[in-house]
Amino acid sequence: MWISIKTLIHHLGVLFFCDYMYNRREKKIIEVKTMRITKVEVDRKKVLISRDKNGGKLVYENEMQDNTEQIMHHKKSSFYKSVVNKTICRPEQKQMKKLVHGLLQENSQEKIKVSDVTKLNISNFLNHRFKKSLYYFPENSPDKSEEYRIEINLSQLLEDSLKKQQGTFICWESFSKDMELYINWAENYISSKTKLIKKSIRNNRIQSTESRSGQLMDRYMKDILNKNKPFDIQSVSEKYQLEKLTSALKATFKEAKKNDKEINYKLKSTLQNHERQIIEELKENSELNQFNIEIRKHLETYFPIKKTNRKVGDIRNLEIGEIQKIVNHRLKNKIVQRILQEGKLASYEIESTVNSNSLQKIKIEEAFALKFINACLFASNNLRNMVYPVCKKDILMIGEFKNSFKEIKHKKFIRQWSQFFSQEITVDDIELASWGLRGAIAPIRNEIIHLKKHSWKKFFNNPTFKVKKSKIINGKTKDVTSEFLYKETLFKDYFYSELDSVPELIINKMESSKILDYYSSDQLNQVFTIPNFELSLLTSAVPFAPSFKRVYLKGFDYQNQDEAQPDYNLKLNIYNEKAFNSEAFQAQYSLFKMVYYQVFLPQFTTNNDLFKSSVDFILTLNKERKGYAKAFQDIRKMNKDEKPSEYMSYIQSQLMLYQKKQEEKEKINHFEKFINQVFIKGFNSFIEKNRLTYICHPTKNTVPENDNIEIPFHTDMDDSNIAFWLMCKLLDAKQLSELRNEMIKFSCSLQSTEEISTFTKAREVIGLALLNGEKGCNDWKELFDDKEAWKKNMSLYVSEELLQSLPYTQEDGQTPVINRSIDLVKKYGTETILEKLFSSSDDYKVSAKDIAKLHEYDVTEKIAQQESLHKQWIEKPGLARDSAWTKKYQNVINDISNYQWAKTKVELTQVRHLHQLTIDLLSRLAGYMSIADRDFQFSSNYILERENSEYRVTSWILLSENKNKNKYNDYELYNLKNASIKVSSKNDPQLKVDLKQLRLTLEYLELFDNRLKEKRNNISHFNYLNGQLGNSILELFDDARDVLSYDRKLKNAVSKSLKEILSSHGMEVTFKPLYQTNHHLKIDKLQPKKIHHLGEKSTVSSNQVSNEYCQLVRTLLTMK
């Protein structure tokens, strides 16, 4: 039996109309049909929902006109599909679905044999409500009296109507006439549901103080500011008759059979009966109505009816005390969320004009700002490592930074400097250079944490920096602050020296990747003389462009596919080889990669004709393929004047629409496949057009050629970019790439020519930093004082008896080899933590046993064997069911995996992986603390505004009952009337009163106390890395959850993000239930993720990482 539930949901900015059905026989809920209403195309225009404080409406993209009526009319066919799914309970019965669909829409009337339907037991295929008589009142009924009620027995009606059919096939004209009773019901149903959805859209407003809920929250806020309790949960419970309701709910629960999957429906029905009894009170009393809403949410949370595979809830969640506790928390949280929302709108100065477009714009701006803040935190941590590694406070604070020079070690500073900069520095220049680096980070950090409209020009074009020194003036020691222009210091020479070296850096990259060993100067110059070519540091201006690795490997698959099973014939010629163990191929691959990023992408993603020709080719080819033409049918053509970036945004938005829907995963693959094919074909055409196909045929040079190579390079970067370049030099490649990607997304919305130019140059700066950012040390003496220091360091990772041989020393057994992983952990400050980790067990060190694993067998033979077996499976998929054959396949991939894990350990690559994992985890935590900083501003400034205070905060400040801070930095607190004056509570009694009221209000709401501020600081300042914090990474995640406890979604997101990061590193983690661990994160299992071979259902699989590596990571997460 089926029960239907209708709901309208607004999820991730997309409006859906959902049909859920519960099957009593199979005891599960399924989502029968989800009808998307927004972010679909109608008349080739994207539909969006636009909301403001007055209500919602459906609009077309880039238009504000209300088109709700027109769009809903266009969506009528989707309603017909919904009715079909509502009528037929077994979606797999195609004949019955075609029959019903033909009744509802003439253009869906297909040729159906009468016998194909009459042979079925029709009743078995009907939804439960149609198995017996159904009663309804037409919409135009004057009232709901008996005389207007219409009865339908669909099963009988269908049988009688089918008996009247005389021919072999259904006669739609006569059949529709006989089925008129059902058709009328369907039209009535669609009409009523259309009105319901329109009403839901109209009511989908952005919450405001004018709404019923908003007025209640506004009243609560006044009570809190007046030091009164906003609500009395006991009093509201009595008015609501909560005791009566809980008794009824528990009685319903106890009457149900064990494992009764319908119990949650029955509980909801009991609540609805209670609501009907007090309906008048709910209408008149806003507080009571809000209380009722929270009771509903409580049942939905603990006794859900829409969740697949749900379990029967716990009766303890129906106890009056438990409900009161949770509802009390929900109401308090609702006040907090309203404060945050109003604070956000006030901060962005859009309270009166707020709509969905402005909220979307804020979302984009905040995502970029938070990414920028994270970059500042990472850069400041690297600066701290250079100046004063054990500093626990904010190193960017001018006083703290000045004091750090008392502890600075010049030799260590110069060593750290050389890992970030190619230019040499002397001891005499250290102090000035340090202040210059601080000046490149601090102004950006202090400006961007305001989280309001920023002066991007000020961000990227900072001309000066400050230096604070103690000087003796008139016999007294005083702090004197001086200001320097970047263009008048050593930084100007450093900056232009790096700019001038760009062509040389490109040549060096070609030399290290063996390109110069296989291509002549003439051939390379041909690359650099492509029409309109100029070496670009911008790469692509289009977000979501596929990586070269994906383009090449997919291109290879298409070009070399088995002719017996053709996929798409894209007419490719350049993807001829895939032999990564071949030096010649690596040279070919590297040169193609350089052309792809430096030449192809900048042109392809800005040249409309070039991009459009590739899109047209792929779409035309798809239409010509018999049996496969539906793959890209949902993708429209590129318009004549449409920019590649605009078309890619459309494709990406279409792809994102489907990624949350399980049943449409295939369509996700189609969109991704389409994007890949456009770039694969585009790159192939670009290479052929510019006569660069010789790259496919590398030929060994007798002598490497690097003379007479001319690389044209021009940039508009100038003195104004020096400061931003300095900050970028303190970021790693991942941080730079992520920052650039966010910048590309954000800059798409810019209108001002000046702003676009500023962002373009900023992206060039990032490109420059990336070009030389990951340079490694060339000599072991750059990292170590002597061999003894090298040996002491390396013996943490490698057994001492192995240090005198390859790959740790050169063939002479004496000269140390610089390991890139060791270089990396020293550069970015994870050395202290990883040394502690590897010191915890000798098992983690490289041993002779690990070296021996590399020589057990020839891994190239194993790889060839796997490729051969895989080809056999492609030709004969049935082999996956042959146990002997699959065992052979499994053994081969086990051997390959064991070799790769041993190689990763021996070459210390796993040290680099652990470094990156540590940075990823700490960076994500720092990002969450940036969100907490933002929310502190929003909530505090809203409260200060309600107090009519003339002060506002711009960061999370300490609010202490016993000890008030007298002075605040200008980036912490400012005066609305005069932002330039120094703020001091000592000189302004009213400020002291305002801050006290702010503290009391936040304390009542359990927000942002000083204990949490300390946790926030430890995370934001990366204090874990200096090894003195006394917390494990897992405990830091607990601290982050504690800081964000004011928002349940954010709090839950913290632990989810830990799972996501570990997943991206090849591991799966499960935590012990929180109720068993006093709500602390405790690892239950940490194991490798599986890679499934021979299809998802095959038992043949391999682990992404080794079990030993999982143990290392588990120790890392729990180590203090």
Swiss-Prot record:
Active-site residues per Swiss-Prot or TrEMBL entry: R445, H450, R1016, H1021
GO terms assigned for molecular function: endonuclease activity; RNA binding
Protein name, UniProt field: CRISPR-associated endoribonuclease Cas13a
Any further remark recorded for this protein: Part of a type VI uridine-preferring CRISPR-Cas system.
NCBIfam families: cas13A_C2c2
Cofactor note: Pre-crRNA processing is metal independent, while crRNA-guided target RNA cleavage is dependent on divalent metal.
Top-level taxon in the UniProt lineage: Bacteria
Record carries keyword RNA-binding: yes
Hydrolase as UniProt keyword: yes
Start and end residues of each stretch annotated as HEPN-like fold 2: 908-1120
UniProt family annotation: Belongs to the CRISPR-associated endoribonuclease Cas13a family.
Organism per entry: Listeria seeligeri serovar 1/2b (strain ATCC 35967 / DSM 20751 / CCM 3970 / CCUG 15530 / CIP 100100 / LMG 11386 / NCTC 11856 / SLCC 3954 / 1120)
The record's note on its domains: The target ssRNase active sites are probably within the 2 HEPN-like folds, and the 2 folds interact in vivo.
Keywords assigned: Antiviral defense, Endonuclease, Hydrolase, Nuclease, Repeat, RNA-binding
